[in-house]
Amino acid sequence: MSFKQYLVEEVTRGLDETYKVDEAWAEDYPGKKYFDVHLSTIRDHEMATPTFRQYLGQGGMKILESGCGSGRWMAFFEQLGNRAYGVDDSWGPIRLAHRHDPDMNLVRATVLQTPYADNTFDAAFSSYVAEHFEEGPEALFREIHRVLKPNGLFFVVVPFNNAFRRFVVNPILMALWRLWKWRGRGLGFTEFRYTQAEMEGFLRRTDFEIVEVKPDDFFAPWQKGLFCDLCDLGCFVGYEPKPPYEFGPFGRAVAAAIRGLGPWVAAGGIFLVTRARK
């Protein structure tokens, strides 16, 4: 079953400031060089990249990214010869993207009610967005289904409730939450971490056909799932990790021990390729 993730309220409020940090970092990369930095990460480290090349590499497709952030995946899809459109409900990432590429097709809107007609897109992508709806992801999936053409592709990534989380991270987090509540500190909901069965159920109920399912993470030696888990634990003790995904001695030891057990054991996300049934 899924795991409902909470963080200290000060941390959840701080998540709203993420793009201020990103904007400050982006000052070092004027113009489209900002996207070049992100594209190198996608090209060299993201497990999802070969799958996107397989399905979208022929180009000529109209693609929606739902919850696009600052548009790094949009830039990648366009590099493959497609036309990308993005929706996000925050001005911060949209301003950041437009500052570096004014021609990007970005609009500010809720991902649950996008400003597009039925059957508009050949494909859609949602990366680490669906988990943030406390009522579940089905409303998001229904909206994406609406704007996709018949048999349109939908790629979706959400945090995965993997074995390392179920048996190690989650019990520690629950103990820390009890401690913080006892100390009178508030906790705020941040996300669900879903199982494969749950995600397949959500998607089938919203008229998507499952094509394939894969782990989502970075290729070794980077492991964004494990890095995020150590960050979640560290926020309770004042630990501030240093980007990009650099482990300390303890993190490197844990990563090395887990790596030989296969990609699913500590995968940060679950990546599903689906088609809209219409």
Predicted regions and their residues:
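Conserved N-terminal segment of class I S-adenosyl-L-methionine
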Residues: 1-116, 123-127, 141, 267-270
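A short hydrophobic/small-residue beta-strand
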Residues: 84, 154-155
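Residues lining the SAM
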Residues: 127-130, 157
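A short glycine-rich, Lys/Arg-flanked "PGG" loop and its adjoining helix->strand segment in the class I
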Residues: 138-150
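Conserved class I S-adenosyl-L-methionine
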Residues: 155-178
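A C-terminal cap/extension of S-adenosyl-L-methionine-dependent methyltransferases
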Residues: 169, 173, 201, 211-278
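Acceptor-substrate binding/catalytic loop of class I
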Residues: 181-198
